[in-house]
Amino acid sequence: MAHPHLLAERISRLSSALEKGLYERSHAIRLCLLAALSGESVFLLGPPGIAKSLIARRLKFAFQRARAFEYLMTRFSTPEEVFGPLSIQALKDEGRYERLTTGYLPEAEIVFLDEIWKAGPAILNTLLTAINERHFRNGAFEEKIPMRLLVAASNELPEADSSLEALYDRMLIRLWLDKVQDKANFRSMLVSQQDESDNPVPASLQVSDEEYQQWQKDIGAISLPDPVFELIFTLRQQLDNLPNAPYVSDRRWKKAIRLLQASAFFSGRDAVAPIDLILLKDCLWYDAQSLNLMQQQLEILMTGHAWQQQAMLTRLGGIVQRRLQLQQQQSDKTAFTVIKEGGMFSRRPHYTLPPEASASTLTLLLQKPLKLHDMEVIHITFDRSALELWLTKGGEIRGKLNGIGFAQTLNMEVDNAQHLVVRDISLQGTRLALPGAAEDSMPAEIKQQLETLENDWRQQHTRFSEQQHCLFIHSDWLGRIEASLQDVGEQIRQAQQC
């Protein structure tokens, strides 16, 4: 087997070649290529004339030797038009019921069926067997069919509770396409002279039959790590608990996991990663409502849980809470405490300064900076006699903010623990302390916990950086995940700086 990174590069180049001349269809081509390389089916939903059939024709060129079959279904389509006409010779000479399948679906590797829901029951029943078992019953014999990719298309969804639901459930990847939107792309499409029948893929990139068969075995060997399974199970539980969530059969879950394995394999990895789970948004929806619902649920999973974002924020909240508890304990120890001297018949308590406050001018530190008189204040200088008078009789108290300028009036009080508290205009308060009494505002316990959390965040970010090179995931998703991780990192850094 080729080196994983070389294989990933080759598949990327193969996809680029297939996308050439198709505008705003890169994601559809890539997912159809992934389906073809893993033997799955695709349903394309969209209005006529948006290159649905061209996408299917292009996929034939991904392989060195691949035959294609395409057919536009109508209400009058017959099995003979899809699976081949009956052999009159065999019926006449030997009495055998046998179809001539050359050039029809049973001998094609790439199959495109347009307006699929217009097919009759006879076609649908045979098609179900072909998709499920990759076998076709031709008269008395079961013949293996080589189909690698079935692309079915329609401009409408099947009716609910109809006989079409069984076939719809077999379409693993479901893509909703629209006409070209970007102005520049629209112009390029109009003036393009590319022949749609030309093969845009160099022979060196095309997949041989031997490679294809070997890759099917290799895909099955890709592991599903426990953390990734837990994410999948979480998503399943979320969907089960939502009233309008689509029903997802066990069969569809199993086939979807194989698609995730294929995504990992063709991205050069030996295990499914959280990034691969984004593909589930194209596998688990049923209609427009469930498509939006799946987008929302996958975004919650990817930006909140896949790289432990929410778990890290929860841990950070616990660390911050613990830090506040320690700071409160430290605040009680270091706060400037006055001595209560209230008399028996006094309506308000009187206070005196403690013995250590003996200087004529006292500088007291704010345990937390406040904005007072339009100034960020970290300490206040008091005249000792003025402070003693205020403690005894109350009234107005003034102090120099940061020790400079004129003494300014202050909103100050003595709390129940006999600590001096100063408040700003919004009544936010902080206690005052003597210089040298305050200790390090970041306890060693908290500092260590924040460092550990930051290291864990770096590991998660590194994991994401290593996994994000996935051809089959749109770059918009990568941007949202990166933003969610950066938000967590920024909150951790802010906590470290406080």
UniProtKB/Swiss-Prot annotation:
Activity regulation text: ATPase activity is stimulated by ViaA.
Gene Ontology cellular-component annotations: cytoplasm
InterPro entries cross-referenced by the UniProt entry: AAA+_ATPase, ATPase_RavA, ATPase_RavA_C, MoxR, P-loop_NTPase, RavA-like_AAA_lid, RavA_ATPases, RavA_LARA_dom
Subcellular location: Cytoplasm
EC number(s) recorded for this UniProt protein: 3.6.1.-
Keyword set, alphabetical order: ATP-binding, Chaperone, Cytoplasm, Hydrolase, Nucleotide-binding
Known role: Component of the RavA-ViaA chaperone complex, which may act on the membrane to optimize the function of some of the respiratory chains. RavA functions as an ATPase.
Quaternary structure and interacting proteins, as annotated: Homohexamer. Interacts with ViaA.
Protein name per its UniProtKB record: Regulatory ATPase RavA
Source species: Salmonella heidelberg (strain SL476)
UniProt gene name: ravA
